Amino acid sequence: MASNLTIDERWRVIEAYFKSKGLVRQHLDSYNDFVRNKLQEIIDEQGEIPTEIPGLKVRLGKIRIGKPRVRESDRGEREISPMEARLRNLTYAAPLWLTMIPVENNIEAEPEEVYIGDLPIMLKSAIDPISQYTLDKLIEIGEDPKDPGGYFIVNGSERVIVTQEDLAPNRVLVDTGKTGSNITHTAKIISSTAGYRVPVTIERLKDGTFHVSFPAVPGKIPFVILMRALGILTDRDIVYAVSLDPEVQNELFPSLEQASSIANVDDALDFIGSRVAIGQKRENRIEKAQQIIDKYFLPHLGTSAEDRKKKAYYLAYAISKVIELYLGRREPDDKDHYANKRLRLAGDLFASLFRVAFKAFVKDLTYQLEKSKVRGRKLALKALVRPDIVTERIRHALATGNWVGGRTGVSQLLDRTNWLSMLSHLRRVISSLARGQPNFEARDLHGTQWGRMCPFETPEGPNSGLVKNLALMAQIAVGINERIVEKTLYEMGVVPVEEVIRRVTEGGEDQNEYLKWSKVILNGRLIGYYQDGGELANKIRERRRKGEISDEVNVGHIVTDFINEVHVNCDSGRVRRPLIIVSNGNPLVTIEDIEKLESGAITFDDLVRQGKIEYLDAEEEENAYVALEPNDLTPDHTHLEIWSPAILGITASIIPYPEHNQSPRNTYQSAMAKQALGLYAANYQLRTDTRAHLLHYPQRPLVQTRALDIIGYTNRPAGNNAILAVMSFTGYNMEDSIIMNRSSVERGMYRSTFFRLYSTEEVKYPGGQEDKIVMPEAGVRGYKGKEYYRLLEDNGVVSPEVEVKGGDVLIGKVSPPRFLQEFKELSPEQAKRDTSIVTRHGEMGIVDLVLITETAEGNKLVKVRVRDLRIPTIGDKFASRHGQKGVIGMLIPQVDMPYTVKGVVPDIILNPHALPSRMTLGQIMEGIAGKYAALSGNIVDATPFYKTPIEQLQNEILRYGYLPDATEVVYDGRTGQKIKSRIYFGVVYYQKLHHMVADKLHARARGPVQILTRQPTEGRAREGGLRFGEMERDCLIGFGTAMLLKDRLLDNSDRTMIYVCDQCGYIGWYDKNKNKYVCPIHGDKSNLFPVTVSYAFKLLIQELMSMIISPRLVLEDKVGLSGG
């Protein structure tokens, strides 16, 4: 039975998975959880708004989210579509309505539903109306029907919240201390709860004592004193709370001795309080210590006095882990193990952002209530509420990426270069580690990332290994309430920690018996003991498979010579992956199930509910024995991979034969696939993207992997199938350049269009001033000259289908003066500035679209889209799907190109030197497979591990009359002579990348200079010069060309004339009244002489003067001002 599950049948399971989940499900699930649960929880956390006024408070009720809408400048409201938000630079957001109940002197008033702000909507989420639309309706409102959603629209631009990778919070992670320090072993806990994170550190010093430190208390607190402050008083209770093992208990003697002078709770609290409330009364110190322990010590366990016992047992468990590490019973925790990582998705990040925004809202409302009541007005909540507090806080964070907690780059502009780059951006995972440090271990591929993170897709350079992408079938847990799972575990027979300690200390039971029991750890917290850990883990799995407990729960049983622990996890952010469950060597998913999947009778989720497929996190996978293939199954196996190639991410999945390439080549291709030009969105004609590229004739690859269809690449491809010859022809394809057939290019191969958007709005300024979009008149400041405005219509905007070039004005606009001074001195017309929008320097094109609309504030908004035809030319960059990139070195007409006996002429000629050292065998195999596909008309499957055998394809092309190694006899097109060697000819999919000569071509003679240094500006966008650097300078010094050196570094850079006093050597200044240069020291009593220097040198002298250093210039050959 096991061997019956063929690749095709398992592929049906994969198709079913993506049919029900999609590719950006992780963001949508997380955001949906936020709007359904977390939003109300944040309101309930607050509960009510207290005020300083006796008897007055406001109770908070349910929160409701409206439909996405825009509030127009005339105060009218109407629903909007995402496309309208994009075009009009609006935010796609919905109003939040909160029920408030004012309570005065315990008398509740009528509940009021109050508008408290706008919440940006994630496209295609549960609260987005378009998630329910049919394909036809989506097309009608201007959306790409295949767009996956998962991003926001803020001020008209698409922004994605990038998944953040973090160490798991609320877990005890032990490690050894730094060599040479006083600390031998440490434990770190990041206690994270609603709204804040508190790091707690436990240290074992060389003298055997344990100390705890956390932010609210300066210095380190001895562990035993903290235990007593938390309510566990006697030495015996403390020792048993830490461990039942006498060997571990013995390690606590130094700590108990150290704290022997402090015996009761108040003394312990006073010890802590004396560090925070210095010089205050004992009662105040104790009270302060209690507040700090409740609020800032392990807040995830609770913040009330009742939770102190829980905190004490948690601390004791952490100490026991440190002692076990010291005794050599356990290894230091691996921070890079994916069981110790959590991903923070849009929902979690939004929750933390909304919490801060809501707190600010509550603070403001409290102030407004008190102010209103003091003035004796009637309570009118709707008038007092300021909704812009919530709206602006959230919008600003999304628009800039600056999140609460000091994180930057959390939200990014969605990369729309092509379809793949967009999907990849939505599945990206960023580590919070600083990229400046080496962190080699963190960047390495870890075994637990198998099936969770793509092994190939990571950037080169400083972010390598820190920026990752989800593997195809990685799924992220949303999490369920811990209390439900805890209750279930106790019902299953787990004995609570306190009960076990009571039995041993008071009941007289044998502690050695309990030592054999397993510790049960729920989300990093020791909750009790169970006799047989293996049995408990299996019971939990059985109940999960039966659907009695949530499939979000994962369990791992860790057993070594000394450790026996059952870890149960149900928190959010764990990366999990689905596997087929195996029983007695047989997979539980049968052929009947697969037939039902195909017919649509059941879905992938049904298989999970039936207990045939389950999601494992990295911790539970430690217990799993997973077979890669059904044929490998033995009775010992617990799970079967659904499909091995699913370990790859989205971009690596499109590479044919990736297992035949050297690993870095696949990494390079993963980066380049995101730069290829194709069809980035089906609604490109309606969109106003800042910059966009469109390939005119994208083709589906002839050699495909199975994942292409799922990703949607076959509908939105980015490349062409090119006939490739591998030979050195003319030498114009040396060093990775390629020769391209000019005739193919003339027939339209790799033609693309580049779109650039220019936009401006009529801004209204305070004081009644405003911009005007008109044809500027000759009198305004900064007027460019009549020929620059020649293309504008009467309304000041260019017409569609007009040719433009760099410097031409597209939108005429005048603005009021920047400074009040100008306004007073000049007439209103003269004071106006020309702020017209001009075509970028060095760019050209045809006006494609003109959009005139208005923003939500009622300002006129004009957008002009310019298109430019890009025909492949020398220097444009291309790449195959195997990391083989190259630029066009020469375009040769078809008549001069080599041709085969059958008259086939290549589109691209690649130099053979590009292949041996790079070992991209995948490309050679793709050429053979592509040749077979072109001859037979059948698409070739090149899925990694499950490909059509290459030998089979070689036999096939032999039947069509071609050599199996794909080489052919070739004639030189220029001479007609036969070329001695046989030449490899195949069909390979090549991509045009967005690095084109037209965007980079740059030169300048004269041009703008910087204000400060008066040296030429830098960069193409600023019409900058080409830097003549230090090394170039050294060459000219070595060569001895003094005049050339002066020409480059002085005459054509920042030559300036200064006047120097011959007595004191200071730089003089020009006195307007006397009409001559004077010395700052001697006035007009000394002679000043002109000196030609570099302006940067003059600047240096003056900056030194500002630092009270007095450089003086000594003059040699003096030439007076009159030349005498």
Curated annotation (Swiss-Prot):
| Annotated localization | Cytoplasm
Required cofactor names:
Zn(2+)
The molecular function terms in GO held by this entry are: DNA binding; DNA-directed RNA polymerase activity; ribonucleoside binding; zinc ion binding
Q: Name one Pfam family in it.
A: RNA_pol_Rpb2_1
Recorded GO CC terms: cytoplasm; DNA-directed RNA polymerase complex
Keywords assigned by UniProt? Cytoplasm, DNA-binding, DNA-directed RNA polymerase, Metal-binding, Nucleotidyltransferase, Transcription, Transferase, Zinc
**Protein task:** DNA-dependent RNA polymerase (RNAP) catalyzes the transcription of DNA into RNA using the four ribonucleoside triphosphates as substrates. This subunit is involved in DNA promoter recognition.
Name of this protein:
DNA-directed RNA polymerase subunit Rpo2
> Which organism is the protein's source?
Saccharolobus solfataricus (strain ATCC 35092 / DSM 1617 / JCM 11322 / P2) (Sulfolobus solfataricus)
Gene name, Swiss-Prot/TrEMBL: rpo2
